[in-house]
Curated annotation (Swiss-Prot):
Main location: plastid
Annotated protein name in UniProt: ATP synthase subunit beta, chloroplastic
Molecular-function GO terms, alphabetical: ATP binding; ATP hydrolysis activity; proton-transporting ATP synthase activity, rotational mechanism
InterPro entries recorded: AAA+_ATPase, ATP-synt_VA_C, ATP_synth_F1_bsu, ATPase_a/bsu_AS, ATPase_alpha/beta_chains, ATPase_F1/V1/A1_a/bsu_N, ATPase_F1/V1/A1_a/bsu_N_sf, ATPase_F1/V1/A1_a/bsu_nucl-bd
Taxonomic classification: Eukaryota, Sar, Rhizaria, Cercozoa, Chlorarachniophyceae
KW Metal-binding (keyword) present: no
Amino acid sequence: MTTNTGKVTQIIGPVIDITFPIEAMSSVNIYDAVVIEDKTEKLSVTCEIQQLIGSQSVRTVSMSSTDRIKRGMDVVQTGTAIAVPVGKSTLRRIFNVLGQPIDNLGDVKNEETRPIHRSAPEFVDLDIRLEIFETGIKVIDLLAPYRRGGKVGLFGGAGVGKTVLIMELINNIAKAHGGVSVFAGVGERTREGNDLYAEMKESGVIVEDNLLESKVTLVYGQMNEPPGARMRVGLAALTMAEFFRDSSKQDVLLFIDNVFRFVQAGSEVSALLGRMPSAVGYQPTLATEMGGLQERITSTKDGSITSIQAVYVPADDLTDPAAATTFAHLDATTVLSRGLASKGIYPAVDPLGSTSTMLQPWIVGDSHYECAQKVKQTLQRYKELQDIIAILGLEELSEEDRLTVDRARKIERFLSQPFFVAEIFTGLAGKYVGLNETIFGFNKILSGDLDSYNEQAFYLVGNLTDAEGKMKTISEN
């Protein structure tokens, strides 16, 4: 490791110019980390080199606040990119972009670190099989299945169950796939990060006393952080996820909340560095930066990283360059509906609004595809009839339409499911439902075999056996 020392020459917000001796410039690389240190001020600020300007100067972006930094302060060249700890010792811990724990639980007992800037896996190492990633959540597995090693966009406003869905996915991947999860909080509210951590402890996703039972690592670069930290925190989390995939040979779930903030931070940094803006004021390197992050999220022959990314759409404009660039990388979309949440149907996943490239007969098989299409057709017809029902009432419908409405209401309720992580709120035992059980149950409803059942028998149950048991209880009462 080289430790050539330079001096701070200019400070413009989070952008800092540094001068090194001319003989030290040969060892300076783009994306290397440098540390501004001042013992009298008790100051240590890490910056990342972004540009080489002139024969002796570099332009850097700070990863933390630049308060109290003065011209003439010493800068130590590390000779390497920002590196973060990796491995099992990171589970249940919260880190910042530099891989430093911020949860007041002491240092991480870990010797291995990895630089956050890494190239995507080589083409020959990729696993190109089209394989469904079973989540155990009926509505997702049936209507908008995830691809193993794929990327999913999660769309939903406040209070519709996004956090609970994320926690259930973390819980299910640990139980069904023996995998772990990494959560990247990119530019979101500090309160939300704190609430998520508290809820994970309450629901058992994080077990404070037992490292091996904990299933998640959290990396936060929140809204109050400088743009450099928000731009790099996604890469820090991805580096930790890559280690679990490559070394532990596990299926890993990577959550990014919110991928728009990653683009937004890149836009801020680009403007601060004086680059000419592109469309709508975004950075000219938008597609390159997004590709650099997304192409590392993939399946290899060792394991997979399946990514679920919350996507904020500015002003609901799907043509916004940030949203449009993100959509190009997604394999599936999971849309959460406030209308379903208001009916108490959880998970409030919109069965008609959610999509997946995996829902093709040659990938999922004919029986799965046909069942999903029939479910969607039934729900679509119910949606079309709702205005007529509201004005004229159910009695004015034809016999066939009344049957469709009855089955659609049963399907709507059967798409709900009790979650393991919500047991403490609902008092109902969580259910993991296999894909075959899901298809069997919905086919039974569609065929008319269960027309005599009360629709409440299908509400918040797992498989068809649970619905039959609930119907028996309803009949007895």
